[in-house]
């Protein structure tokens, strides 16, 4: 462990999360608010805590997160990715376990752009034969 804080940057869709963790009691603060206050849905909170629960470190670290961009789902995914990277920065032996669960890999799916002459990314205008 180098220094007191371990950090990791997580990304998902258009969200970016900078995560800092240090030894503590398991408190998670996102953008200055408790995680329960910041994320409205329980599923988002669960997504954020998955790497900690998998590695049995849920009550080991105090985590401070700065997250920006995107919506609730993207931000939760970015926080999970950032926590995963910070845990690997803390202890590299956790990487195989986290990698097997699929938390280390950055989810590269992005919104496809709308094309000219289409209603959306792929939805075409209605075809009229006559």
Swiss-Prot record:
Q: What is this protein called?
A: Small ribosomal subunit protein uS9
A GO molecular function annotation here is: RNA binding
Q: Does the keyword Hydrolase apply?
A: no
UniProt record similarity statement? Belongs to the universal ribosomal protein uS9 family.
Q: Which Pfam families match?
A: Ribosomal_S9 (PF00380)
InterPro entries per UniProt: Ribosomal_Su5_D2-typ_SF (IPR020568), Ribosomal_uS9 (IPR000754), Ribosomal_uS9_bac/plastid (IPR023035), Ribosomal_uS9_CS (IPR020574), Ribsml_uS5_D2-typ_fold_subgr (IPR014721)
Ordered alphabetically, the record's keywords are: Ribonucleoprotein, Ribosomal protein
GO cellular component entries: cytosolic small ribosomal subunit
PANTHER family referenced in this protein's UniProt entry, alphabetically: RIBOSOMAL PROTEIN S9, SMALL RIBOSOMAL SUBUNIT PROTEIN US9M
GO BP field: translation
